[in-house]
Swiss-Prot record:
One of its GO terms (molecular function) is small ribosomal subunit rRNA binding. InterPro entries: Ribosomal_bS20 (IPR002583), Ribosomal_bS20_sf (IPR036510). GO terms for cellular component: small ribosomal subunit. This is Small ribosomal subunit protein bS20. Belongs to the bacterial ribosomal protein bS20 family. It comes from Neorickettsia sennetsu (strain ATCC VR-367 / Miyayama). Keywords: Ribonucleoprotein, Ribosomal protein, RNA-binding, rRNA-binding. Binds directly to 16S ribosomal RNA. GO terms for biological process: translation. It comes from the Bacteria. The keyword rRNA-binding applies. SUPFAM superfamilies: Ribosomal protein S20 (SSF46992).
Amino acid sequence: MANTASAKKMVRKIKRRTLVNKMRMSRIRTFVRKVRKAIAVGPKSAAAEALRVAQPEIHRGVTKGVLHKNRAARIVSRLSGHIKKMA
């Protein structure tokens, strides 16, 4: 339990930051899910468009500190690889 005023304030700040980070990660996951769904059902153009929309969102996660840059690159690389394999 936080004893000092500054420690109590830090607990409040961490709670706020955690909530924001959870929302950001949820948003990123939603975009990735949309791309995967487009790859599974739609034509190649729809999947490519979904990735084009998702890519800035994924890299924004890196900028905001919720994703490691290598993980973001891996996600984008794998999704684009799946799109390239589409007929």
